[in-house]
Amino acid sequence: NSQSVSSEHFYLSDDELPRYFSAGKKHRMEAFYRKMRQRFAILMDSDGQPEGGQWNFDANNRNKLKASDLPSVPQPLVFSNDVSAILERLKRHNIKTMGQAHSSLLWPVNRQQAKELLDYFCRYCLPLFGTFQDAMTGRLKQRGNNRQWSLYHSRLSFALNSKIISPQLVVDTVLAHYRAQQGQLLCAEPRIDIAQV
């Protein structure tokens, strides 16, 4: 049995969702995304229109990584969190798991690490996140470089899903960084990241 409950972690409460997703109709995330931007005044101008004059820049995020782009791909910020005690506890209690676990976890495990990763994303990855959002490459591995495996992605989903940080914090931080760097970032970059959140 499962039960749905509301959480302050989300922008909408559980009982508000039916207003945005009527039963029996087809829905597009783009339409929902626009409604959320309007409701919460995210990247909207004073006339209620999207900043920059358009809702999305999806056509701009389908670029392929060329060999000349690879040297500028940032090395991901990773952590070295010792989880050996947790692994031992799982083993001691015969808890079955999927996959293979290592004694060092590279994901953030507390708010400080999650905020550090968010700040790192804004500083090093956000400027080209939109440009290469959908890009994939095996070239880095072919060159013996596994350090840049995450390309320009934030890798914040673990911190968000485990509620270490909130979507509100991510959106506010990305917007603050965008406003501070306005002349240097394409208008597309924060929109694309915010849509992902």
Residue ranges and their predicted role:
Residues N1-W107:
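Beta-rich, aromatic/charged-enriched effector core domains that present basic-aromatic interfaces
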Residues Q113:
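Conserved functional hotspot residues or short segments at active or partner-binding sites
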Residues E116-V197:
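Gly/Thr-rich phosphate-binding loop signature of adenosyl cofactor/nucleotide-binding cores
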